[in-house]
Amino acid sequence: MQYSQKVLDHFMKPHNIGKIENPDAMATEGSPACGDQVSIYLKVNAKTQVIEDIKFQSYGCASNIATASIITDMALGKTLEDAKKIGWKEAADALDGLPPVKIHCSVLAVDTLRKAIKDYEVKHNLAKADKFNKETIVEELKKIIYPQVGEDIVTLKMVKYAGFE
């Protein structure tokens, strides 16, 4: 598997790594199928809604660490609204590409950033918390990829929805 020099640089010397004590918001996302996990911590200026500090912790492969690193670089100094617009393709492009089997790492990093922003918005009454129901569970499970076949957990019917049948 060939990695770009930017991926290797962000993997070997990740930016914004660590944990913010008393963050304004945080989120942890992961994929049980591949074992990757990312946590993102935010400090946000309450008046301007600008991300003043952002840190991440990652458990995963080189692509996972590199995409979390680049996402934090891209979000730092942006308003929450602008940071929400950062997409997985933009993150992968900023790293000069990712191997096709590692694109899910940029999706995971973007999802984690958006969940951290949502956490901030909910805590500050800027958004409502998502409802917990069968549809939200199914949507979350569609993000979990079974790596040997590249299909999502829902399609493979590897789970049952306890209490929703």
Regions inferred by a protein language model and the residue ranges of each:
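Domain-level signature for proteins that mediate thiol-based redox and metal-cofactor handling
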Residues: 1-165
